[in-house]
Amino acid sequence: MALALPVAAQKEASVTLKVNDAKEKINKEIYGQFAEHLGTCIYGGLWVGPDSKIPNTQGYRNDVLQALKDIKVPVMRWPGGCFADEYHWMDGIGPKESRPRMVNNNWGGTVEDNSFGTHEFLNLCELLGCEPYVSMNVGSGSVEEAAKWVEYMTAADGPMAKLRKQNGREKPWKVYYIGVGNESWGCGGNMRPEYYSDLYRRYQTYCREYSGNTLYKVASGATDYDYDWTATLMDRCKDFMKGLSLHYYTCYTWSGSKGSATEFNDDQYYWAIAKCGVGVEEVLRKQIAVMDEYDPQGKIDLLLDEWGTWWDKEPGSIEGHLRQQNSMRDAMVAAYSLNTFHQYTKRLKMCNIAQIANVLQSMVLTKDDKMLLTPTYYVFKMYVPNMEAVNIPLTVKCDYFDAENEQKNSARRVAPFVSCSASKMADGTVNINLANADLKNATKVTIDLGSIRGRVQNAQILTSKNVADHNTFEQPNTVKPAAFSGAKIANGSLVVDMPKTSIVCLQIK
């Protein structure tokens, strides 16, 4: 049944597609995922072990595996995050009963048994058909440890290859993405950029390429508005890296309450939309400008390898496990963010939402043998056709709202009620992605299609009665996509009648 919700007070917006300017491909890695040893992201989320009563394949939850296959996960980052700089990979190989236990000092002091290690992660990537992105331990590890890890994973012969074969894996894995440290300005060592730059150059030297495997080396980059860190690394390391990371969270404060995931007022909602829309666009634009200064040829990519919402933990959950619910507000954050990412793919190579299961803005939530799909998951599923399509630049004219700016001494953010992106697939199909963030008003969006011809197909809408609505194990289908009939083409324009707080994706072919 197609859904065309009633339109009460209706605003108007217009979009102009610049079809002739379409040339930059939307890298599928923009839709990357992040799995850290944090709370129940790995243990209970992805992994239950082969002896579990929960249906599994080689220890991986079948329900989660299928959910991730359905959104075509292109790349997965592991083992962290802050965890990466305390992780010693050799503790996570060999017979599981012989692996030493460890305390996860960063995240709640949980004691882990190391049953999920290198083999388990890389085999998971093979099952999903995605690229692994492995973060090396620079904070508490050694150059030798990092070098041997790369050799263990990718060499066909030699002492580390022999050890890998003894542990049951004859053929080396293909590992392309290597992160040299994580948040080295913070939990990864509280380093100065000058010091980390020297460490990066040293570590990457000994991460060698074996047996035809190519390494894409990523330096630990800045957080948010730290442009000096980016400038220092670009100045000192540009000849030694393929990519530079960046972290940006929709988080109100790093001290004190971050606000509830499901109980918030209108001002808090609009702050989040402005933070993920205008805020992330500003950071990407300014960080890329710094990179352009040192690398005008665009040889070095930017990787936003941590992003998403960060609210207070779910009531009753364990401190430090960062388990949070996921509402229609989070779905709107995802849509606004992805629409923005599409505009920067000339430099933006990869984005990894935090995190894949049970942590922060997750795709799925699990509890014992139950699993539910979050509103954010559905946005990722609706946006799948954009992977590897060519971004179509566009302009949007609509009403704006102003919201608080959490940066001190900064003006309030002014953000659009309507966010849009468009892309063209190899077969000529055009994807249109729209989000109406207005809490009170429907919006009639008129899109000038230019030379595009075809019919509206596969139109879907994600919306709910209340923007705080979310899926629970008791009611897992409160927020889910439905077929949408409120779009039509007339006189060279696509007209979409968007309900309030809704996300619409459709195709023209």
Where are each of the predicted segments found?
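N-terminal signal peptide c-region/cleavage motif recognized by signal peptidases
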Residues: 4-6
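Active-site His/acidic residue clusters
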Residues: 249-271, 317
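Non-catalytic accessory regions flanking glycosidase/transglycosidase catalytic cores in CAZymes
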Residues: 8-243, 277-281, 285-313, 317-509
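Histidine-centered catalytic micro-motifs
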Residues: 246
